[in-house]
Amino acid sequence: MKFADAMQCIGKESLCFHPELNVFVNYPVLIGCHIGYLVVIVLLYKFMKGRTAYVLKYPMMLYNTAQVALSLVMAINLGQFLVYGVFNLNGGFTGTIEYWIFVHYATKFLDMFDTYFIVLRKKEEQLSFLHIYHHVTIGFIWGLLLHHGVANGTAFFGAWINSAVHALMYFHYLYTSLGYTNPLKTYLTQLQMIQFALCILHAVLAVVAHSPIPKKWAVLQLCYHLTLLYLFMRFYRKGMRKLKRKAKV
């Protein structure tokens, strides 16, 4: 496997191994796509006003199946770098990591269909601030890392663990779309919070330890995952309170 000097890659302020993909991570694309996401939500809301909710059982089954498959492929291809240390803090940059992080970034735009399905099915109770915040920021941040040439080396960990968790999450969605109840749903939220806690630990280590990636990006990761952990903990507590009220009834 070909490794490159991390500092040379970072100095390019560009994808190091796949510069042909730079067009997909420039600022007009990053900003435009995420503004477009919000515009589509508003337009769909207006379209659905006065209309009956769509069922979308089979489109969602196909969508969730594709998401499980994509997430597994990304997790497997990025997981090979775990042998260089859990966080690969001092790892060299490779074309493989850069490519699969780009794929991971691209899937964040596919993930936006989670929101579109919610609006079309009129499941407004699922459309929380956490949901919108996550979808409008995660792709933008990965795009920033790619745009500045730092989505490589130790950055593999965030994409790997997110892909692994997403494989389980979309399998849950697929399973429940078939009409089954998943008794492990609560543990899935706990797993997501563990993911954020590990990403926070990863960011702290990247700040205090020697790592070729500039510390400002580790600080960005730290701050971002702190917000996600806080919001998910609020969501989890709210869900647990709701379960307790149902149990009393």
From Swiss-Prot:
It comes from Leishmania major. Pathway: Lipid metabolism; polyunsaturated fatty acid biosynthesis. This is Fatty acid elongase 5. Keywords: Fatty acid biosynthesis, Fatty acid metabolism, Lipid biosynthesis, Lipid metabolism, Membrane, Transferase, Transmembrane, Transmembrane helix. The gene is ELO5. It is found in: Membrane. GO terms for biological process: fatty acid elongation, monounsaturated fatty acid; fatty acid elongation, polyunsaturated fatty acid; fatty acid elongation, saturated fatty acid; long-chain fatty acid biosynthetic process; sphingolipid biosynthetic process; unsaturated fatty acid biosynthetic process; very long-chain fatty acid biosynthetic process. It is a multi-pass membrane protein. It comes from the Eukaryota. Involved in the synthesis of fatty acids. Elongates C20 polyunsaturated fatty acids (PUFAs) with a preference for n-6 PUFAs. Its main location: membrane. Belongs to the ELO family. One of its GO terms (molecular function) is fatty acid elongase activity. The active site is at H134. Pfam families: ELO. PANTHER family: ELONGATION OF FATTY ACIDS PROTEIN, FATTY ACID ACYL TRANSFERASE-RELATED. The chain crosses the membrane at residues 23-43, 68-88, 100-120, 138-158, 159-179, 193-213, 217-236. The lineage of its organism: Eukaryota, Discoba, Euglenozoa, Kinetoplastea, Metakinetoplastina. GO terms for cellular component: endoplasmic reticulum membrane. It catalyses: an acyl-CoA + malonyl-CoA + H(+) = a 3-oxoacyl-CoA + CO2 + CoA. A motif (HxxHH motif) lies at residues 131-135. Its EC number is 2.3.1.-.
